[in-house]
Amino acid sequence: MKMSDIMDIATSGLRVQRTRMNVTASNIANAQTTRTAEGGPYRRRDPVFHAQRVARPFASSLERSLRGVEVDSIASDPREPVTRYMPHHPDANEEGYVAFPNVNLVEEQANLVSSSRSFEANLLVISKVRSMAEALMRIGQ
C-alpha cells in the first residue's frame, strides 16, 4: 500500500466530513425557517455517502479493496414538519397552526461533534503519514 493511497483515503474523509458539517450547520441555522423558496418549512438535510475506489485496476487484492468515501447526494428528511399553534404567525394555516422544520437541535449538535471528531481523525492520519514519509527520507542521511 502506498502512502499516497492512505493520503487519498484520508483526504476523501476530510471532504466528506466538511460537507457533513456544512449541511449540519445549515440545518441548525434553518431550525426555525417556516417558509422556503420551494414552499413550506425548511426540510432537514443529510449527506448520503458511498465508497469510492482508490486503487488501480491491476493492483493486488488488498489494494483493490481500498476505498475512500465521497458524497453521493444531499437527501431531505422525509419526516413530517412539526406543527405549533401560533394563530398570529404570518405562515399560520386557517386553524392557526404553523409548520416548523423537523430539526432536532440535540441531534444536530451530536452530528456536528461526530463529524468534527471524524475530521480530526482524518487530519491525524495525514499528519502521521507525513511524519512517516519524512522519517523515511532521513534514513539514508
Where are these regions (language model features)?
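Amphipathic alpha-helical polymerization modules
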Residues: 1-141
